[in-house]
Amino acid sequence: MSKVTVVGAGNVGATCANVLAVNEVANEVCLIDIKEGFAEGKAMDIMQTAQLMGFDTVVEGVTNDYSRTAGSDVVIITSGLPRKPGMTREELIGVNAGIVKSVCDQVLKYSPNAILVVVSNPMDTMAYLTLHALGLPRNRVIGMGGALDSARLKYFLSQALKCNANDVDGFVIGGHGDTTMIPLTSYTTYKGINVSEFLSPEELENVVKSTMVGGATLTGLLGTSAWMAPGAAAASVAEAIIKDQKKMIPCSAALEGEYGMKDITIGVPCIIGKNGIEKILELNISEEERAKLHESEAAVRKTTAILKELNVL
């Protein structure tokens, strides 16, 4: 029997739980939220699609009773507040750090061997906090951001090439932010051939730019942050763990010398399986890409340093 807990029943969390159920990633999904009745309602709504969608996964909604999350193989953390008007970045980090730290303490109390997938923002910083505040081995804390950013890259590539998104491949490394992510065009292909054979440098640059502002574009259109792709991206990471897929997924991982970096969590290509991050792939990237990665590193370190300034770590 496999079990996944999703903490936070908002748009991203509920979408994630729905994708997990429809794809029958686990036998049981526990959706938990602090708001009375909210997770129960979302879970009931999902379960009422079971016959329509043909899945057998059981989704249970819970209000703030972490004992019901016991025995989870994977815990996906989506809880946290969005940045409100007038709120400084430091204030946002302080609030969300407190939420994430409290949640992690609770889930590990009942599922001490769970692998944690962090979605809460700022994602690289929250993954770093989770790892160091709890003293977990680095394979058990995974930041979801690269999976989402890479999905967006593939979407914009498919639009430029006028092809199916499943015919293109590519991924994004670096921080999960519109100025810190690095779409690796040198590893981007269409049916196994580098996309530079099909797109002009200008067209490829437009794909890169669209990817980097992908989240902001959706916020402008929707009036709020996106949730469909983020929820599905988190579910895809959980699926790779539960099904031991040994799948290459770009994720925010703790580095111990890879790419010349230590004491940081940042997006890099990882092999994801039953043990979480089973391997970090150190690719032969160009000097330009490496320089961009170190620029991203500096930005991520600056944000992560706020945790120590606030005495959270």
Predicted feature descriptions by range:
Residues 134-140, 149-313:
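C-terminal substrate-binding/catalytic lobe of Rossmann-fold NAD(P)-dependent dehydrogenases
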Residues 34-72, 302-309:
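Conserved N-terminal Rossmann-fold NAD(P) cofactor-binding segment
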Residues 13-14:
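N-terminal Rossmann-fold NAD(P) dinucleotide-binding loop
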Residues 9-10:
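Glycine-rich Rossmann-fold phosphate-binding loop(s) that bind the pyrophosphate
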Residues 1-4:
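Extreme N-terminal starter segment of soluble prokaryotic enzymes
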Residues 88-154:
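Rossmann-like NAD(P)(H) cofactor-binding subdomain of soluble oxidoreductases
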Residues 51-114:
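Rossmann-like NAD(P)-binding element
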